[in-house]
């Protein structure tokens, strides 16, 4: 009987810890369903880091997507080894293709004769998407965009 009591107390403590852990788990608010370009309309802020035509650098891009997944007001503020601090306005960001699971391709212009093709993955709740350049020679960019 005495041995049973020694086992019951730790068992109760473990059970209470499990109940507490389950109660504190945050449930996902991600919506289920197909992701479309229209889901992404609105203001975005994207950060990029990597190696490009100006060497290693970072860039902050702001843009407003319309319901078709296009923006013509992209502003890029960059800081790089080769070009220093620059600002480029009137650029485009366009979602070229987007699968129902949020995987797709986007294009970002950065002035005359300058642009990137980015692979993207939209989060299930449509609040962010990551980007990576895996197609443009000598450009190695990665980043994330946040819906504002």
Description of each model-found segment:
Residues 24-148:
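Mature soluble binding/inhibitory domains
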Residues 3-14:
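Bacterial N-terminal signal peptides that target proteins for export
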Residues 1-4, 21:
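Coiled-coil-like amphipathic alpha-helices with heptad-repeat character
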Residues 13-22:
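Bacterial N-terminal signal peptides
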């Amino acid at each position: 009987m005495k041995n049973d009591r020694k086992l019951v107390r730790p068992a109760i403590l473990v059970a209470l810890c499990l109940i507490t852990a389950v109660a504190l788990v945050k449930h996902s608010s991600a919506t289920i369903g197909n992701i479309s370009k229209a889901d992404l309309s609105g203001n975005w802020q994207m950060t990029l880091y990597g190696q490009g035509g100006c060497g290693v650098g970072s860039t902050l891009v702001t843009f407003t997507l319309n319901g078709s997944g296009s923006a013509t007001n992209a502003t890029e503020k960059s800081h790089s080894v080769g070009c220093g601090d620059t600002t480029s306005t009137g650029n485009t960001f366009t979602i070229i293709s987007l699968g129902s699971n949020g995987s797709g391709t986007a294009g970002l212009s950065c002035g005359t004769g300058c642009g990137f093709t980015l692979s993207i993955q939209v989060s299930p709740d449509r609040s962010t998407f990551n980007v990576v350049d895996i197609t443009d020679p000598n450009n190695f960019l990665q980043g994330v965009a946040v819906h504002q």
